[in-house]
């Protein structure tokens, strides 16, 4: 009986080790979320969100295949380098930041699509609207150990969303019919994560 209990305990321990998750935290000092949108049909305006948080869970420390990803952005941290424009973007014409202060990416999974390349599919919530989204992701130079003995990895993720899908409904147009602000928003995320 004691031998049986010992075997069962060993199997349970092995099982727990096998399913242990490795957790990685976003390093906000080395991460940025940038966006770009066409203005008046003749140029582009870009900006970024400066406050964010996130984490990744992997099956081990050597691969991000099938990793689980969550991300949260503070809408009020929007910065286009023009204060009046930033305030307009926080208004109900765009993000309604007072009512919807967070954007989130949840239930997202990385799937390998090539050497150092992934697809990230998940649920993006902006202004209370949740839609499926897919990012193209490049892993930058694998996994490294920094000079302070921390394990790090870096990624660049990109996608395009239609802002009207998320009720970002500002729709002023020129007399010619060209929108003042285009529908498509290009998003680029440069993210650095540190193993916990």
Predicted feature locations:
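Bacterial Sec-dependent N-terminal signal peptides
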Residues: 1-23
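Low-complexity, acidic/polar, glycine-enriched regions of mature
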Residues: 20-196
């Amino acid at each position: 009986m004691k031998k049986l209990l010992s075997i069962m305990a060993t199997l349970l321990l092995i099982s727990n080790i096998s399913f242990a998750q490795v957790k990685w935290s976003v390093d906000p000092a080395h991460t940025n979320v940038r966006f770009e949108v066409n203005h008046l049909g003749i140029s582009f305006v870009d900006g970024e969100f400066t406050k964010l948080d996130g984490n990744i869970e992997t099956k081990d420390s050597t691969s991000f295949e099938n990793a689980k990803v969550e991300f949260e952005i503070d809408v009020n941290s929007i910065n286009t380098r023009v204060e009046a424009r930033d305030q307009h973007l926080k208004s109900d014409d765009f993000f309604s930041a007072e009512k919807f202060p967070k954007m989130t990416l949840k239930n997202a999974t990385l799937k390998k699509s090539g050497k150092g390349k992934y697809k990230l599919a998940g649920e993006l919530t902006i202004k209370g609207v949740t839609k499926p989204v897919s990012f193209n992701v490049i892993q930058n130079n694998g996994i490294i150990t920094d000079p302070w003995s921390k394990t790090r990895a870096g990624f660049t993720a990109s996608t395009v969303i239609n802002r009207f899908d998320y009720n970002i409904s500002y729709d002023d147009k020129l007399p010619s019919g060209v929108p003042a602000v285009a529908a498509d928003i290009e998003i680029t995320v440069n993210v650095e994560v540190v193993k916990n």
